[in-house]
Amino acid sequence: MFRIEYSLVQLLLRNVTIPLLLIIQMHIMSSVKLIQIRIWIQYVTVLQMFSMKTKQ
């Protein structure tokens, strides 16, 4: 009985862990993309401000 439950738990863990890892990975990737986009936006705004200052 204990052995069957143990194998069931292992199976469940395996079936839950892989999607969870995938979800976490996707989340990390999307947050990294968000951070990159933010950095890019900041960079562009700084460049725009700099060009405005040099035009004056």
Curated annotation (Swiss-Prot):
Expressed by the venom gland. Coiled coil: none annotated. Its main location: secreted. It is found in: Secreted. This synthetic cationic peptide inhibits the development of Plasmodium berghei ookinetes, kills intraerythrocytic P.falciparum, and is cytotoxic to the Drosophila S2 cell at micromolar concentrations. No antibacterial, antifungal and hemolytic activities have been found at micromolar concentrations. This is Meucin-25. One of its GO terms (cellular component) is extracellular region. Residues 1-31 form the signal peptide. GO terms for molecular function: toxin activity. It comes from the Eukaryota. Keywords: Secreted, Signal, Toxin. Belongs to the non-disulfide-bridged peptide (NDBP) superfamily. Antimalarial peptide (group 5) family.
